[in-house]
Each structure stands twice: as structure tokens, then as C-alpha cells.
UniProtKB/Swiss-Prot annotation:
This is Ribose 1,5-bisphosphate isomerase. It is an enzyme of class 5 (isomerase). GO terms for molecular function: ribose 1,5-bisphosphate isomerase activity; S-methyl-5-thioribose-1-phosphate isomerase activity. The active site is at 133 (proton acceptor), 202 (proton donor).
Length: 327
């Protein structure tokens, strides 16, 4: 089946591979796919004993968890579904797991809609919003504003190296929002035309720091210098509860070929195979924006100053968080 475990369903492995390859992207989309994968694992499990069923579900969760270390929505989704796995028989465990996954997916869909309504309240007719990368939560705010009849425009950073800004631009044009696409290095120049910076988050730490696509921190610093408010749109599944107990957030490093493919590298170094060519390529996927550069974090529970999100974390997750896939 796969070297990640004989008990893991092929469909789960496929989902894990798609998350790792960023074919499934966006924190909410990743969380939804993870919940769906656990439901599929539960449905297709051939376990005959309850302990074997639980072992298979945890193995599936671990396979999914190991794909994206920074996207905290993934472990939060896995924790939620596994916490609802309950019963004394395989049939009961199967039914409870599937029901829990479906509940999570319903709540997830409603959360984004609620978040969008909160974020839309920050926008006024004629506002110009600068975006970075592609965030379904940030887009939910803009969509809600458009549906409310608010006339807005967008300045969209292309977001190298994977050009996720193109996805954002495409969606905004489908809503008839006027869009200006800019290269990343032009943000400082075009901030003079912006009323807001609106970004998403892959995760948010207990101190209010925002972990998001590389380039977010630099944009936030420049925006503060120019007096442009920075809003982070993030569902509470992106809060990182482990940071309450001193854990740090791992910054994912992606393949250097996203920046330079083999032919481009050879052209720079004038070597055929790139071995010992003296060229190093760094490709961190995310950076950390300190809370002092963020004006507000918008969630489905309302709008919060970044320094207060730890209170929300404690309400939602308690003081400690288990990793059930390790049990």
C-alpha cells in the first residue's frame, strides 16, 4: 500500500501527498481535506477489533500530520476528529468518527462565512485593499463586502515563487473587483494607494505573532511605516495551542527548485550538474510577523487585538494539548 503504514488507506496517502505537494493548499482547505481523509479511513477500515481500528485511525492521522509542519489547522482538525472517536465496537467507532468529521466540516464552512462578515465590517466604499498570497479567509472578507454592496479595489502581490497571488486575482475578478497585480518588490510604492492590508495566516502563536507566507512580515513593517492598518483574517483552527506551553513554530523549507530549476541554476553557475557550484538557494515558505505590526485579527468569534488571542486559545483548547496520533 505505502511505506507509511500498511493500515493507512490509499485515499489517505493520496490526500497526504497532495497536501505535501501543495496541490491542496490553504489552511481551511487542508483542514477540510484532513477531516475528510479520516472519515474515509474510518469508512474503509477492515479492522475487526476496536483497538485495531483506533490504531489505524491514529496511523492515518500521523501520515497526514507529517505533511505540513506549519499549517496548524491540520493538527487542529485531526485532534478534533479523533477526540470524537467513541464507542465499544468497531461499528460504533466508525460511526462516531465519520459523524465527527462531518460535524467539523460543517462548522468549518460556517466559520468562514461568519469570519467574512466580521472582516467586511472593516471596509468602506472606495477602499483599496492590498493582499499577499492566497487566503480563503481573507477572500471571505472581501466576498462578504462585495455581497453587501461595498465597492472596493484590490492591489494583489504576485507572491513568489509559486505566484499564489494569481489565484487571489482570479477570484477577485470573478466578483468584478478591479485588481492591480504587482511584483512583490513594488509593495512599498503601491501602499500609498492602499487603505488596508489584508492577509491570512497559516498559524497564530499565543503572543499574537502571525506565521504566514514569506513576505508577510516585510509587508506589515512597511504598512506600519505608511500608516496602513494590517488585518489578519484567520479562523480559530489556525490558532497554535502548542505555543501556550513554550513550543516554537517550525518554519517550513520548500524545494529550492521552486526558486531556481536545474536549467536556471546551471545557467547561473555555468556547470552541468550543479554539484559543488558554490550556490545556495533558500526557500522558506513562511515568516513571523510580530504582533506590534498587526492591528486586528479577525476570526469567526469576532475581532481581537493580537495580544489577546491567548485568552481565546485557552477558551477553545484549554491549557494543554495532546497529540493523539502519538498515543
Amino acid at each position: 500500500m505505502d511505506d507509511r503504514g500498511p493500515d493507512v488507506a490509499p485515499a489517505v496517502v493520496t490526500t497526504a501527498d497532495e497536501i505535501a505537494a501543495m496541490e491542496i493548499r490553504g489552511a481551511a482547505t487542508i483542514a477540510d481535506a484532513a477531516a475528510e481523509a479520516l472519515a474515509i479511513q474510518a469508512e474503509r477500515s477492515d479492522a475487526e477489533r476496536p483497538d485495531a481500528f483506533e490504531r489505524q485511525l491514529r496511523a492515518a492521522a500521523k501520515t497526514l500530520y507529517e505533511t505540513r509542519p506549519t499549517a496548524v489547522s491540520l493538527p487542529n482538525a485531526l485532534r478534533y476528529v479523533l477526540a470524537g472517536m467513541d464507542g465499544e465496537t468497531v461499528a460504533e467507532l466508525r460511526a462516531s468518527t465519520i459523524a465527527r468529521a462531518e460535524e467539523f466540516q460543517r462548522d468549518l464552512a460556517q466559520a468562514q462565512s461568519k469570519l467574512g462578515s466580521v472582516g467586511a465590517n472593516r471596509l468602506r466604499d472606495g477602499d483599496v485593499v492590498m493582499t499577499h498570497c492566497h487566503s480563503t479567509d481573507a477572500l471571505a472578507c472581501l466576498e462578504a463586502a462585495v455581497e453587501d454592496g461595498t465597492e472596493i479595489e484590490a492591489i494583489v502581490k504576485e507572491t513568489r515563487p509559486r505566484l499564489q497571488g494569481h489565484i487571489t486575482a482570479r477570484q477577485l475578478r470573478e466578483w468584478d473587483v478591479p485588481v492591480t497585480v504587482i511584483v512583490d518588490g513594488a509593495a512599498r510604492r503601491y501602499l500609498d494607494q492602499a487603505d488596508h492590508v489584508l492577509v491570512g495566516a497559516d498559524s497564530i502563536a499565543a503572543d499574537g505573532s502571525v506565521i504566514n507566507k514569506i513576505g508577510t512580515s516585510g509587508l506589515a513593517v512597511i504598512a506600519r511605516e505608511r500608516g496602513v492598518p494590517v488585518t489578519v483574517a484567520a479562523q480559530t483552527i489556525k490558532l497554535h495551542p502548542d505555543t501556550m506551553t513554550g513550543h516554537t513554530v517550525e518554519i517550513e523549507r520548500r524545494d529550492e527548485r521552486e526558486v531556481l530549476d536545474d536549467d536556471e541554476r546551471a545557467a547561473i553557475t555555468d556547470t552541468a550538474d550543479g554539484a559543488d557550484d558554490g550556490l545556495t538557494v533558500e526557500n522558506p515558505a513562511f515568516d513571523v510577523t510580530p504582533p506590534r505590526y498587526v492591528d486586528a485579527i479577525v476570526t469567526e468569534h469576532g475581532q481581537f487585538p493580537p495580544e489577546t488571542v491567548v485568552t481565546l486559545m485557552r477558551e477553545l483548547f484549554g491549557e494543554t494539548v495532546d497529540e493523539p496520533w502519538e498515543l
